[in-house]
Amino acid sequence: MGSGSSSQWMRSGSSAAAHSRAVALRDRGLRALKIRFHHPDWRDDVRVVEAVRAAVGDGMEIMVDANQGWRMPGDLAPAWDLATARECAAALEPLRIHWLEEPLPTADLDGYAALVASTSVPIAAGEMVRQEHEARDLLTRGGIAVIQCDVLFCGGIGGCRRIAGLARELGCSWSPHTWSNGYGLVANLHAACALSNHGYVEVPYDPPAWSAERRDWMLPFVLEIAGDGTIAPPPGPGLGIEPDLDALERWRVA
């Protein structure tokens, strides 16, 4: 049975807190982590990345999520423009990050192409991609290095397989975003184990607000990351899991 290399997500927070959290994850065997920007000034987030890189050295991959791909109704600040994305990418170049994720709105294909041409930092995008043509545009017109489509959103395992195959033909990788629930994680793990160009599988984990128990509440067990930083899909037929019907019963409305 295969397994996927996992990356874990953390909000940038303070430099000191991120430093200690990153060291703890590294000591657990994690090979990679992703830092999500959230400060009003992205330069403060870059300082957090600097602290994490200093803490873990080159022993872990660091991904950075600028979180500019789409907006929530309550988001008051505008998305980054190309100039901001370029400036941020330039600041991150010395920190040897694995990728810069969604530094521009998903539909800004010309912006992505210009950014890719101006930086050595690999650019990732596409976590909310629903259709194959959207992924194709990001890969061919936008020139991104990593497509992040999720099995739950892009037509299931079959749809994701087609997109990952397109990425492979273009010399790009697929790394599922997987920010959903235990079922989504299991489905993406199975797909990742079957596809040769997958990179890391993102594992939602940001306690106490987002714990493994909260993520996997519908499953009969909690998915655990092994000491070598990998996570294996359940071994049974199909997805290898049955829903926890008792857990679902509490949400019955009729």
Give the residues covered by each predicted segment:
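Shared catalytic-loop signature of beta/alpha-barrel
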Residues: 96, 107-124, 129-230
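Hydrophobic alpha-helical scaffolding
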Residues: 11, 78, 102, 125, ...
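Active-site beta-loop-alpha junctions enriched in small/polar residues
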Residues: 5-9, 36-40, 65-71, 75, ...
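Glycine/Thr-rich beta-alpha phosphate-binding loop at enzyme active sites
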Residues: 92-103
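Conserved, mostly hydrophobic/aromatic
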Residues: 33, 65, 100, 138, ...
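Hydrophobic faces of well-ordered beta-strands that scaffold small-molecule active sites
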Residues: 2-7, 31-35, 62-66, 100-101, ...
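N-terminal capping/lid subdomain adjacent to the active-site entrance of alpha/beta enzymes
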Residues: 1-94, 213-254
